[in-house]
């Protein structure tokens, strides 16, 4: 299912990696098919760097989307929603719309309200780095990773096929989920881990002893890694997935309270059971990821 003219709005880590991967996939495709890539970004340095992979680069959203068959929105979540509100004015004849946002309910709700001339589906690649920007983008970022697709009221069989093929072209594995279930799941495995890492990092930084950092090793580094994630992106994620995130923070606090009570009461048997069950859950998770 081939789409010739693609416009990527936002050339950060995700949008940049998608653009690089699509350019590479199209270059290696047999037979070769026409492919035109437009990049829209507000950062002058990013636009300058994008010239090596794009056929057209602009900071003008209207100009960027005017001839696109498929528009891919790769900005922070609330910006994606704002762009979706603008699209009917900028493209009254409609087009295919896809996004890479990390929370889906607000985005898919905005997609539902697009005119009939549009076809739209939500997307979320389950991968990333703790660094942001086009300079961190790589064409293999999505390879062998789960890529969630969230159908909307504006999703047609044609668009679902296009989105599925795009995900496969990126080297990822598509998984279809409804938006609300997606948001609940990623609150557990993505948004809560960020909050845990952020709280740990803030706590350690406030200890106030410069000898702490030489003492820290791989455990602290691995646990705190995602605290380096782009704050603007995380702000949008946390505010647009507020209910699910707060629920998971509460569940996590309960876990900490439970184990704190076991330590406080010196309940060795129960504490060992808690630790053993945790270890078993971890290895079950690792096996499930290995099995794919």
Q: Residue ranges of each PLM-predicted region?
A:
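Rossmann-like NAD(P)(H) cofactor-binding subdomain of soluble oxidoreductases
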Residues: 83-135
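Short glycine-/small-residue-rich Rossmann-like dinucleotide-binding loops
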Residues: 75-77, 101-102, 125, 200
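NAD(P)+-binding Rossmann beta1-loop-alpha1 motif at the extreme N-terminus of oxidoreductases
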Residues: 1-65, 70
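Internal alpha-helical scaffold of NAD(P)-dependent oxidoreductase catalytic cores
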Residues: 139-225
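Rossmann-like NAD(P)-binding element
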Residues: 61-91, 96-98
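Residues at the starts of beta-strands that form the adenosine-phosphate
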Residues: 5, 34-36, 119, 146, ...
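Interdomain hinge/lid region at the active-site interface
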Residues: 209-279
């Amino acid at each position: 299912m081939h789409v010739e003219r693609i416009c990527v709005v936002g050339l950060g880590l995700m949008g940049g990696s998608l653009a690089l991967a699509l350019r590479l996939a199209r270059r290696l495709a047999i037979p070769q098919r026409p492919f035109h890539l437009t990049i829209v970004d507000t950062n002058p340095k990013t636009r300058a760097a994008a010239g090596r992979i794009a056929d057209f680069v602009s900071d003008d959203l209207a100009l960027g989307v005017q001839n696109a068959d498929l528009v891919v929105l790769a900005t922070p979540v609330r910006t994606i929603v704002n762009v979706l509100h603008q699209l009917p004015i900028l493209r009254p004849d409609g087009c295919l719309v896809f996004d890479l946002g990390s929370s889906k309910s607000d985005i898919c709700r905005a997609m539902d309200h697009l005119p009939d001339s549009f076809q739209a589906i939500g997307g979320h690649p389950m991968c990333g780095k703790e660094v942001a920007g086009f300079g961190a983008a790589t064409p293999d970022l999505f390879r062998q990773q789960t890529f969630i697709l969230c159908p909307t009221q504006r999703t047609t069989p044609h668009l679902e096929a296009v989105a599925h093929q795009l995900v496969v072209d990126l080297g990822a594995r598509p998984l279809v989920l409804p938006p609300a279930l997606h948001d609940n799941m990623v609150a557990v495995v993505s948004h809560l881990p960020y909050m845990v890492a952020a709280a740990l990092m803030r706590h350690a930084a406030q200890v106030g002893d410069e000898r702490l950092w030489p003492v820290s090793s791989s455990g602290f580094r691995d646990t705190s890694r995602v605290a380096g994630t782009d704050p603007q992106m995380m702000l949008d994620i946390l505010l647009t997935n507020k209910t699910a995130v707060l629920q998971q923070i509460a569940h996590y606090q309960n876990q900490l309270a439970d184990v704190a009570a076991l330590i406080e009461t010196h309940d060795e048997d129960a504490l060992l059971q808690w630790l053993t069950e945790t270890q078993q859950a971890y290895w079950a998770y690792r096996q499930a990821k290995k099995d794919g």
